[in-house]
Amino acid sequence: MSRALPGFLFAGLSVAVVLPAQALVAHEQKAAGAEIRRTGFGVPHIVADDERGLGYGIGYAYAQDNLCLLANEVVTVNGERSRYFGPDKATLEQRNNMASDLLFKWLNTPQALADFWKAQPAEIRHLMQGYVAGYNRSLAEQTTQGLPQPCAAEWVRPISTDDLVRLTRRLLVEGGVGQFTEAFAGAKPPSTQKPLQVDSQQVQALQLAAARNERFALERGSNAVAVGRDLSANGRGMLLANPHFPWGGGMRFYQMHLTIPGKLDVMGAALPGLPLINIGFNQHLAWSHTVDTSKHFTLHRLQLDPKDSTRYLLDGKSVAMGKQQVSVEVKQADGTLKAVPRIIYSSKFGPVVQWPGKLDWDDKFAFSLRDANLKNDRVLQQWYAMDQADSLKAFQDSVHRIQGIPWVNTLAVDAKGQALYMNISVVPNVDAVKLARCSDPRIGTELIVLDGSRSECNWDVSPEAAQAGIYPSSRQPQLLRTDFVQHSNDSAWMVNPAAPLKDFSPLISQDGQPLGQRARFALDRLSSLEKTGKVSVENLQAMVMDNEVYHAGQVLPDLLKFCASELGDDAARLAPLCTALKAWDGRADLNSGIGFVYFQRIVTSMQAVASRWRVVFDPQNPVHTPSGLAIEYPEVATALRAAMLAAVDEVAKAGLSADTRWGDIQVSSISGKPIPIHGGPAGLGIYNAMQTVAGRDGKREVVSGTSYLQVVTFDEHGPKAQGLLAFSESSNPQSAHSRDQTEAFSKKHWSVLPFTEQQIKADPAYQVQVVKE
């Protein structure tokens, strides 16, 4: 969709093909320019006269910091990983390359890209055109100078606006069909299969996919607290934003400040390839997002025609499945390319997905997936409207009107001291009555499976909704308060216990369910602060940085009691564990002792013991139940003893000693030398949630967790913000800004975020670069 940059030759890169929507945009292009002012940690403050110029500055600055990252993601969303890296390797998200390619070839067809582009208003098109031109300008300069080593390869090329659309559509389906990549790619009718045709590699891929789906909310979780004037220390709004997102890849946040004088002035963080702010603040308000528990897709069980397993019965009539041929270029062992075709089958609801043992395609049934966000072409308009909002009402009205938020909640505050929560996103319009009539109650509500043989079981259509088949915003949870609202990836029910949000469709929010440990921590902490006075900025920062392990308060006393009286013949073997637990400070700080590691192992083992709680969950007391380990029950005591013994063995096997500290174990090495990282597993009630994978020498490498942090309040002049980008601004290990904020985060050093002209120009690291086409 964008013309080639004049004056630059890219050696070794193929000539671009004509893009589907190119004719739509040729007349809209004009020269662009921007001023990029960098302050501490290399954060860019980009100023331009219009959207095209602003996009130009964003794309240019982003490529300076993250060229290899975006180039890699462009390969992914074009379905070209098998072409460049081979079919059997995996993406950063551990998706099989071939499966990933099939999904994106199907998702990002020329028609889908053209339709999305056509739906964008001129402002969004100009932002995207500018971004492409700016990125390509930086690429040309870096190509001349020598590309960074990780991407000095043939797969790096100039991008187009189609590529930005592909990236955006990839983000949209993260909460839907994107979670079923392997199940999508592996769907074949039974007549064409060898016995089940599930080889060991496919089994492993599906197992990884299942684990990844379960981790979705953890990897893309979040905490947010919005404090209103009745509770804030300064009588104004106060916001804590603590999204938990991946530290690498296509969901890695980028910090920036965007200004079009007289029209836009917003600072915060954005996901790769997006020319706007997703989480941030402006002169009037501040906001954040948390991944919601709402359902953004449904599965439809197809009753197959007994004569043909590629036909299904709908209202008694036999209907042929759609067949779409997708071809993936695959790199062979000798380096040549081979086109591998694959047929994608679909019903009127969406593509057929197959998960052996879970969602089988046999001669009786198959399962089709309908993703609500496939028709969401409003997402970029939504965030740009939020970025420009000059009041909380305008902000809220934009979310109601556009309905472009894909799979997150929104929490916001304004300078007047209002605190807002909205569980408004793109959710299938299926109420409790229809769900009871059209689904098997034995399946539960973790996956919504509707009867695909009856049209009446499809999604309802509301004239009030921005898109056919989704819930209108008026029927989704929202709450405006002057004390507080908070959220940590539970349902909307207990956002504020003084005003429970109840009786919504099970696809939107379920009440009466146990809260996660982080929500319990937040509500308990806010209640304590409310009793002792007002909430300050420092209080909100401490919620993240003091690294309290909330779950320890519920079970550690019983663990110590068990250590003191129930060890018997295992006393000597368990003595180091019990000593470490007693000495542990109950936190996930860098200096926290080995007792924290033992505690994690024990709790993980005990998750499988259904009778472990002394006090079971009580919907009337959701903040403080369940609690207490029922060590007086023989089955619990037996399981606990086994868990403790296993923990001792695991710690010994990892080579950890009694003197090991948490900061010796949990690290980030993405920029080179390991940096110790505080925080820990979200399931333990650690607000500063971190997800890790096994590293070398018993270490744990952070892959996801606390990412962009901001605490924002207001005075008579506007916003006062402090923040951090935990993994730093640049993903290039050679950059000066690949580890500086990570080191600051490790030391718990927040930074004042310069927002006004005076603050920006007074910054000691202030530098200016003017870029023009």
UniProtKB/Swiss-Prot annotation:
Keywords: Hydrolase, Periplasm, Quorum sensing, Signal, Zymogen
CC annotations in GO: periplasmic space
Propeptide feature ranges: 200-221
GO molecular function: hydrolase activity, acting on carbon-nitrogen (but not peptide) bonds, in linear amides
Catalytic reaction equation(s): an N-acyl-L-homoserine lactone + H2O = L-homoserine lactone + a carboxylate
Signal peptide segment: 1-23
Coiled-coil boundaries: none
Pfam families assigned to the protein according to its UniProt record, in alphabetical order: Penicil_amidase
Top EC category: hydrolase
Biological processes, Gene Ontology terms: antibiotic biosynthetic process; quorum sensing
Location in or out of the cell: Periplasm
Presence of the UniProt keyword Transport in the record: no
Principal localisation: periplasm
Active-site positions on this chain: 222 (nucleophile)
EC number: 3.5.1.97
Family, as annotated: Belongs to the peptidase S45 family.
Function, in words: Catalyzes the deacylation of acyl-homoserine lactone (AHL or acyl-HSL), releasing homoserine lactone (HSL) and the corresponding fatty acid. Possesses a specificity for the degradation of long-chain acyl-HSLs (side chains of 11 to 14 carbons in length).
Additional free-text comment from the UniProt record: AHL-mediated signaling mediates quorum sensing in many species of Proteobacteria, regulating hundreds of genes, including many that code for extracellular virulence factors.
Oligomer and partners: Heterodimer of an alpha subunit and a beta subunit processed from the same precursor.
Listed name of the protein: Acyl-homoserine lactone acylase PvdQ
Species whose genome carries this gene: Pseudomonas syringae pv. tomato (strain ATCC BAA-871 / DC3000)
Lineage of origin: Bacteria, Pseudomonadati, Pseudomonadota, Gammaproteobacteria, Pseudomonadales
Name of the encoding gene: pvdQ
